[in-house]
Amino acid sequence: MNTKVSRQYAKISENSIQKISLALATPEDVLEWSRGEVHRPETINYKTFKPERGGLFDELIFGPLVDYKCSVCGRKYRKSNENQLCIATKECKIRGSRILSKMARRYSMGHIALNAPILHFWFFKIDHSIIAKLLGLKVFEGNSKVPTTITKTAIENLIYYKSHIVLETGGLKSLEQNKIIDISEAGLIYKNALIEIIEFYPPGSEEHNALAESISELADVTSSKIGREYGVDYYELNEIIEEFSSARIATGALAIEYLLDKIDLRAEKAAVEAELAGVQKQIYKNKKIILKNQKRDKLYKRLQVINAFINSGQDPKMMIIRNLPVIPADLRPLVQLDGSRHSTSDCNELYRRIIIRNNRLKRWKAAHAPVIIIQNEMRMLQEAVDALIDNQKKSTNQVTTKEGRPLKSISDALTGKKGRFRQNLLGKRVDYSGRSVIVVGPKLKMHQAGLPRKMAAVLFEPWIIRNLIQEKKVGSIKMARKMIEEENPIIWPHVAKVIQNKPIILNRAPTLHRLSIQAFEPVLVRAKAIQLHPLVTAGFNADFDGDQMAVHIPISPEAIRETQELMFADKNILGPKDGEPIVNPSQDMVLGLYYLSQEKAGAKGEGSFFSTYEAMLKAYEFRSVELHARVVLPFEQVKPFIAKTMRGHLISTVGKFILNNIFPANFPFIFDDNVDELELNYPSQIKKYVLPYGTNFREYIQNLKVNEPLNKKAIAKIVRQIFDTYDGLLAKEDIATVIDQLDFGNYQNCVLLYEKLRDYKKQKLPVPHLSKLSEFTIFEYSQLYKQLQQNGPVESYRVLEDHEKAELLEKIWFKYNNMVCSILDKIKDLGFHYSTLSGTSIAISDIKMAPKKHEFIKEGENYINKLNTFYAKGLITDDERYVLAIAKWTQIKNDIQEDLNQSIKDDNQNSLVMMMKSGARGNISNFVQLAGMRGLMANNVKALKVDAENERVVRSIVEVPVKSSFLEGLTSFEFYSSTHGARKGLTDTALNTAKSGYLTRRLVDVAQNIVVVAEDCFSDFGFVVKDIIDTKTNTIIVPLLERIEGRFLNKDVYDSRGIKLASAGTMVDLQTAKKIVAAGIKKVEIRSILSCHIKNSVCKKCYGKDLATNRLVSIGEAVGIIAAQSIGEPGTQLTMRTFHTGGVANVEDITGGFTRLIELIDSHEHPWGKPAKISPYYGIITKISDLAEKNAANKGFLITIEYKTSKNEKAEHIIRIEQSQKLRVKVGDKVIPGQKLVEGPIILKELLAVSDARTLQNYLLKEIQRIYRMQGISISDKYIEIIIRQMLSKVQIIENGDSNFFIGSIVDISDYQEVNGQLISQNKNPAFGNVIVKGAKQIPLLSNSFLAAASYQETSKILVHSVISSQIDKLEGLKENIIVGHKIPAGTNSNYEPKSKFDIRNPLSFFMKNNR
């Protein structure tokens, strides 16, 4: 939208904004925005509290305080009179008082007409001074042939009137062009200039005499004490020089304005490009010239500023302010406090200072005061305006309050967490929301949450009021509101009625990933706490120790449908991070299921036969058979589906029969904890538990091995298989087509119609889905039939109304999609029930001591005594003794752990052991502390970067371990020793959480605009994947199976016999992946995000499977944000401690953890420890020689690599290695570019310089995966690929060819390819550039959207560069659309697929006549 056409910004509809541009405001622009000049520093009258006329809150300028009230005469008008002029009095007509809403005070601006030009603070202080870069002032000092560049500081001194500049030499040799005249050398420079000028005039002339007098006075002043201390009078001497010659010397903003007026931008550009070409040649000749590299970078930056002004066509003089805008009054409010005190925004004080100084300058000028006084006043005015623009960045003279607090300027209102971008534009406060403490709601269904009645009454107040009035319970809104406030019992039935089909959204801070916000169906509870389903706590990372949650209410019908379809907890079963269920039972539920599935040999009732399941339950209730006894039931009682093919009886425990009874009839029977791939292993597994007729049950059972009960891991595997079996396969549209064909006469045969449907894989529906769908359909139709019959007889062939069909569709669709959750709810109920029945309790007597503990402790003490003896004799150093002692105590603790493990192995009745083995709570490490020894404790010594670089031993572990266990009790020393570690754990966690949150924020900014936008980009450029192997330990980090599952193949896959296993362009499912791996294939070429051709986005085939839905990703999915959340969310689990156990803090120890992750993602050039040396060539290691032979002081090695040059000649390259670095190669080894020669982290820039982008991508992927996998966290490759793609998305231009790029500019890789493609097609010279790697901190700052970049970091720098280049934001990303109030271009606002897993269309739309 062209903002030049309309200045009525307040009336622009946010939906009509298509793009936003920034430019330098001209003085005319400011006058056009303004509704009057502010010329008085007063705000409000201290008696009347009314705004002062012409002051900072003037109602005529900024709008009325009361709606539609004349600011002059006080007469009130109606809304219909808005924008009219008041003509009630003569004064009203003279002043042009306009009738406005008080909202005008939020957008009406004023201005201050400055009495001196003022340079905008941002343009000489931000990013090493834009003014300095643009002018590029140089001066030839003396006889020097090389010019000296005038520094940023010198220009700042000039702006603040501390020094003067020679603007015109007037032919005087003593004055060099652009020479900055500093106070220390002013006397000599002026003296030489005057001596040179005097020669122009004959002796005895008036001019000669005047100049001679001036020279004499100057000599007296410079030799006097005052002259030496305070310098000379610049202004008088400048006037003399200007009067008697054509030279000109000036200072302040006027001098800068003169220089900006004279600059020839195109000539400057040509000069810079020529200089750049010369520097570039020197660098190519000698790549080690660091100073030349720095010079080149400075020239790049200068060229960028010059180009910005040329391309935008703006006048650089517009960086000088003549009319200062005054922001609307309500954006810098003055608030009345108790009594007659007022609190005001800091901006008002800053504006006040400007107005006072501006008025004073005006008076001095009118009084023709001496130049020095006027210049001083101009300097003070410059400082006052600077303080208003950016008070924080002022190095000196910050404007402060009485208490010494710097005042908040306009820049502070924009930047930081509390600034306009992040506080008000990206994050807003929400109406219809509340918060309360959460408690467990074990009786809730998965899609439900308990909402306190009081909260519901307030949140749904408008709907309740409407209901009360409609049902004539009250006569007015006021009465209804009073009734709700008083909690009148009449309202509760209406509250219950109103909340039907109105979902609520729950959010728990910190919102680390999308599962921290989920939706539920509200269930009213009488308490004051929100009740939460126990299975969804994992997604929220919530517990019930006082956590609070926020509640939000979606209001519009579209928002409600979106919430129900996309955000309901029963739709968020899988975690997006790894595609595994996140709703697995834990704690009490696991303990209950563990207890339920236990088997006991010889238990009461073992071998009993029951004819029915109910008879077995009755016997259990009468206690004639135990829960853990193995009994026999007829096959058809348990699995009627399979009974048709298998006959006989089934053996299991009473508990396992109860457990299996909650699963659908066609789900495999669970006999033991071997639950991997139940469907595949079922036939072989079932044989030993099925007995033919006539078998002696008791005898057979006695010989049968007792099975292990189900632990947490086994239950998680069962949940996964339940999801795979019963997760929805159809689209809503498919079920609608069946409902459309049914009536009350044929609904019983709906299964025939369902059999014709095909799932999203184009396959027939499996039997479990057919049976469940027909069951739901028959039930809902019969219910509707009964309901209609209450109003009279219903014909069987009656055609259903559209709204009836829509209602049926909603109910069947909900039940169909809720199949998995209904089973999970049954598992949850069973777990809680049997954990209660188990009566599990613990006592101190349950803790059994480690049998051989004291033997191990004795062994350790003897070893330590030996070490001390060796140290005393000087055989080992103190550091070596410390390292060996730590290693020994670590081994002793491991031995005690193993001993304890053996002693509790068969103790299945011990409650503590049950909790540990089931995975409900605690692990062997906790048990060792209770019953073995506490072990080594952390010290408060921190490993520093310098320790890692110098391989120092860091004593971060207390050498003397805590030998006692909690059962024995700690000694006073041991207790004191363990306090360090306990506190360190808590502080680390707190720091970790903050750093992890910051990492997530940066990653979101990096990848926020990556959305799935197309079906296929038709890229034929693949990505070869294989097992990610840690070359140091030779262990697999990520297996090939995980890397190819859910991805599209780029090439056909054949086995060793040439048989095709999978075709190119197909998505690899789990079975195909297993087949490929089983065939022994080591490498597979897949489609990858790293090779997707879509600009700033990705296509479905390059992305593959959406892990959260377990099917192909939908168009509109914001995969960039999901990737950022998936990498950032587990960040808190990554330990920030280095992994060394008190030994040498070397590189190997610091390979994992949060620190290394940040190094990789931010592309650090100085990582922890000594960086690895890498091979720059393809070659062979021919020699590894010892450096000590040549120079004893420098110990180390020289590695000689023999390689072939481009001319195929043999050459040698020698690399120096320090002695402390561990070699990874030997003589005769072949090396490739980028290969590590020694241990240590690789610097990403170095790797990119010697190899290619693909090598760097593989290295980053491997390293990031290794960090997470070491902590047991699995993250999908595709998320890391998205971040890597963004890190390598920029190209630096080295030759611009015929393109519009300029040398040194950093451009997006897709723009670079697009421009080059066009140039090549037109037979023109393409541009050449190098791919550069940028860290996550810098990528958002290089965004094409200045709104997205400015809302991230360095706001003022981004805005300055956007302004000088008149940048246009096309609002393509997510952040910028949120800022302007648009819907984001993703999800349901993009080209959303109708036949996806979730459908947000109105159910009526499927049955509308015009839709058929």
Swiss-Prot record:
Q: Which InterPro entries match?
A: DNA-dir_RpoC_beta_prime, DNA-dir_RpoC_beta_prime_bact, RNA_pol_asu, RNA_pol_N, RNA_pol_Rpb1_1, RNA_pol_Rpb1_3, RNA_pol_Rpb1_3_sf, RNA_pol_Rpb1_4
Gene Ontology, cellular component aspect: DNA-directed RNA polymerase complex
Textual note on the cofactor: Binds 1 Mg(2+) ion per subunit. Binds 1 Zn(2+) ion per subunit; 2 are expected compared to other organisms.
Q: Which Pfam families does this chain map to?
A: RNA_pol_Rpb1_1, RNA_pol_Rpb1_2, RNA_pol_Rpb1_3, RNA_pol_Rpb1_4, RNA_pol_Rpb1_5
Its quaternary organisation is: The RNAP catalytic core consists of 2 alpha, 1 beta, 1 beta' and 1 omega subunit. When a sigma factor is associated with the core the holoenzyme is formed, which can initiate transcription.
Query: What keywords are assigned to this protein?
Result: DNA-directed RNA polymerase, Magnesium, Metal-binding, Nucleotidyltransferase, Transcription, Transferase, Zinc
List the PANTHER family.
DNA-DIRECTED RNA POLYMERASE, DNA-DIRECTED RNA POLYMERASE SUBUNIT BETA
> Per the entry, which co-factors are needed?
Mg(2+); Zn(2+)
Which purpose does this protein serve, as stated in its record?
DNA-dependent RNA polymerase catalyzes the transcription of DNA into RNA using the four ribonucleoside triphosphates as substrates.
Q: Which HAMAP family match?
A: RNApol_bact_RpoC
Q: What class of enzyme is it?
A: transferase
Please state the gene responsible for encoding this protein: rpoC
Q: Supply the name of the protein.
A: DNA-directed RNA polymerase subunit beta'
- The protein's organism comes out as Mesomycoplasma hyopneumoniae (strain 7448)
